[in-house]
Amino acid sequence: MKLKYADENLISRVVKIWLITGLVMVFMQIVIGGITRLTGSGLSITRWEIVTGSIPPLNEAQWQSEFELYQQTPQYHKINQGMSLSEFKFIYFWEYFHRLWARLMGLVFIFPFLWFLWRGMLSRRLVPRLLVVVALAGLEGFFGWIMVASGLIQRPWVNAYNLTLHLTMEIGRAHV
């Protein structure tokens, strides 16, 4: 009987560490998103490729191709015309890091969630909340792309309402 109690404590502690790690990652994503916004980097990646977008440009030809796509955006024409490739790499880094961190958060959340669920390590009360977190994460990524797309058409900036929704969903996810 004592062993079972010890196992329950261990399970509870492991789940708590996982949830706290998720909260810290959400906070870091908000900080990274703020840096991305303040550096004007959010429109530097003009495509939304969930899997292949995980790999940054690896050679000069790929960098030049990404830069040429950016040069077609309103932000480049109205604000950053004449930007060098090295300046582009700086803003690209922040948007790339923002997206990469989001993908990492997804992996850090979904695999342990499925493992804990399969092993019966999550309380019945916690499972619906965590499913809401999964749904919010997917919606947030979708709204993030809508936000970026809003700045690639006519304006050199993103729609403020979309930005607010994107940030609010991130904060809301931390409170579920």
Where in the sequence are the language-model features?
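Membrane-interface helix-boundary motifs at transmembrane edges
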Residues: N9, W118-V127
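Membrane-interfacial loop-to-transmembrane alpha-helix junctions, especially the N-terminal start
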Residues: V15-I17, R124-A137
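N-terminal signal-anchor transmembrane alpha helix
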Residues: V15-S54
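C-terminal ends of transmembrane alpha-helices
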Residues: V31-R37, G138-R155
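Long, glycine/tryptophan/cysteine-rich extracytoplasmic
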Residues: I45-P74
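Individual transmembrane alpha-helix segments
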Residues: L69-L107
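Non-cytosolic membrane-interface motifs at loop->transmembrane helix junctions
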Residues: R155-H166
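Conserved small/polar residues in nucleotide/adenosyl-binding loops
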Residues: A174-V176
